[in-house]
Swiss-Prot record:
It comes from the Archaea. Coiled coil: none annotated. Pfam families: DUF6834_C (PF20755), DUF6846 (PF20897). This is Uncharacterized protein AF_2093. It comes from Archaeoglobus fulgidus (strain ATCC 49558 / DSM 4304 / JCM 9628 / NBRC 100126 / VC-16). InterPro entries: AF2093-like (IPR049429), AF2093-like_C_sf (IPR049266), Af2093-N (IPR023291), DUF6834 (IPR049265), DUF6846 (IPR049264).
Length: 245
């Protein structure tokens, strides 16, 4: 299991000359979903830590990338392969990914807390994927970012059919609307047809709103700050997204 995830993560990072531990951890979670699917519910933080360590400390497979060398720039610790000297653009790319990753990882526990509160009264289990159960109805929630959800959309569409219940991707708010507009333009119809739901948590306000899709248990609607958000997005953004062409 660990080996498969490490190998998938190594493929994702192939060609990279500099990374951070934060980026590796964030992408390890994505790869774990791809390999494990709904089984991710039963996995704790130790698996992701083991996968992360494989790439920067002690490889657990010959197919694992190994970013064995460290260099600290400012407050950020970068890793790169032995005998490879990263260039300026390599560090710039790694720093961009670091900022994206740190923002997500810092918001992760808050996102889970907000989602738990939304599903108050449901039994909850899992860390990187949460399963909420009540009266025979299941909701599976995976935590990601809207940009990563865009890249992994095929995996998320597959998950809708794999789980025995509803599948929701929980993402944090962004500083700009463009990532959401991009996803809506490209994949909103596919998501709606499949039944994929995407809800947005504001980590600062600790609120949650629907972006695409609603829960089948309409008693849950009261948990959204703005229950009409997904309907408003669907109505107004069909015109707005043409601006991206």
């Amino acid at each position: 299991m660990d080996v498969e995830i490490v190998e998938e993560l190594s493929k994702m990072l192939a060609g990279r000359k500099a990374v951070t531990e934060e980026e590796i951890r964030r992408k390890a979670i994505r790869c774990a979903l791809k390999i494990m699917g709904a089984r991710l519910v039963g996995i704790d933080a130790e698996l992701i830590e083991d996968v992360t360590c494989s790439l920067i400390d002690c490889p657990i497979t010959l197919k694992s990338l190994h970013f064995s060398e460290k260099v600290k720039i400012g407050d950020v610790l970068f890793y790169h392969p032995h005998v490879i000297k990263p260039e300026k653009e390599d560090f710039e790319q790694a720093y961009f990914e670091y900022k994206q990753s740190k923002k997500f990882l810092d918001a992760f526990d808050i996102m889970r807390e907000v989602t738990d509160r939304f599903f108050e009264g449901y039994e909850a289990e899992g860390r990187y994927m949460r399963k909420y159960t009540k009266d025979g109805r299941n909701y599976y929630a995976f935590f990601s970012t809207i940009d990563d959800t865009f890249e992994d959309v095929d995996i998320h569409l597959r998950m809708v059919d794999e789980v025995d219940g509803d599948y929701v991707v929980i993402v944090p708010t962004e500083n700009e609307l463009n990532p959401f507009l991009k996803f809506f333009k490209q994949y909103s119809e596919d998501a709606k047809r499949a039944g994929l739901k995407i809800w947005v948590v504001n980590p600062d306000e600790k609120t949650i709103d629907p972006f695409i899709g609603y829960p089948k248990d309409f008693r849950l609607l009261k948990g959204f700050k703005n229950p009409k958000a997904a309907a408003l997005v669907s109505a107004y953004w069909r015109v707005t997204v043409t601006d991206l062409d």
